[in-house]
Amino acid sequence: APKISKQYRMIATPWRALSVLDRFRPTSIEVSDKWTLTQAARWARRRGIGSVLFSHERLDDMLAGWLRRQFGVEAAVGALNRRLVKQFDVIVVTSDYSSGEFSGLGAELHKVPLGVDLETFHPSMRPQGLPTPQGDGVIRLCYVGRMSHEKNPELAMRAAMELHRRGLPVQMDMYGVGPDLQAMQEESRGCPVTFHGFVESRTEVARAYADSDISMSVCPTETFGLAVLEALACGTPVVTSNRGGAYELVDASSGASGFPNPSGIADATTALINRLGPGLRASARARAEQFTWQESAHTMLQIHAGLAERIARRPYWKDNLVDARSAHREK
């Protein structure tokens, strides 16, 4: 799996993975890669095994963001998705937004929201009695995630800079590393923006959320938004864009949303600032409690069990091959 950038690896020899599957002999398979491992669906079909594609990204919006253009992307992604629907028995998505690219293709779609660790990410990570905002009146904002344009960290930063320009007392704390970090550091000079780098401990990540008054998770092409749930679980309300999977997680009781531009996010943040307090933090936690890993895992196991029951598993093809060779030698 060679690196194709500082952030990502790609499986270059997928047939080696299929060889491992032959030894493992699964009753169903689940694939999370739309590029290099889709041939696993053909492998499964030849053996009478059910196949699930877990779609973690919306390719049309993601590629349009990378290429900085929409023209030609929808047609290419549409062709790929039609092929995926034919290859896999089931497509799993995490949100209504992420299901959109499979609309009208005849896919067997299942929406399975992800979950959050409600014990690690907990309001108790915030010092007891700490007001929101704190005594100095500064509104503490945070962004937790990769400093890479597909996550739109620069939008969160620019919204904080816009709030500062409007005269609001804010402090933006950015946690994470990535290819856009240096450019963002240079752009935010002179503004109340602090970059803390990579945070290794999940406990420290939870503390970063809990110590903040508002978490900014504003990517409009996020198919779900684990960072949203982690912040909410810590009792921290969230500002997000008014489209995308993260938008589906943040309701009126737990945060706010705005147009995905610095002014729109700043407006949403300003409206949320006026609602800060213990009640909002309690509502944020209650919203996160609706999403558990136990429920996600249970739903996925049901999908796999259903596939195993309804797809008549053919005899294992290598066993047949061995039997045929033995019969030939006996002759």
What is the role of each PLM region?
Residues 237-240:
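Short hydrophobic beta-strand element within catalytic cores of glycosyltransferases
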Residues 220:
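Aromatic "clamp/platform" in nucleotide-sugar-dependent glycosyltransferases that forms part
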Residues 182-199, 203:
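Nucleotide-activated donor-binding/catalytic signature segment of Leloir-type glycosyltransferases, i.e.
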Residues 251-263, 270-277:
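Conserved acidic donor-binding segment of nucleotide-sugar-dependent glycosyltransferases
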Residues 21, 85, 198, 207-212:
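Short alpha-helical donor nucleotide-sugar binding micro-motif in glycosyltransferases
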Residues 39, 46, 59, 73-90:
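Membrane-proximal helix-turn-helix segments that form the acceptor-binding/catalytic region
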Residues 131-161, 173:
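Conserved donor-binding/catalytic core segment of Leloir-type glycosyltransferases
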Residues 97, 115:
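Carbohydrate-associated surface elements
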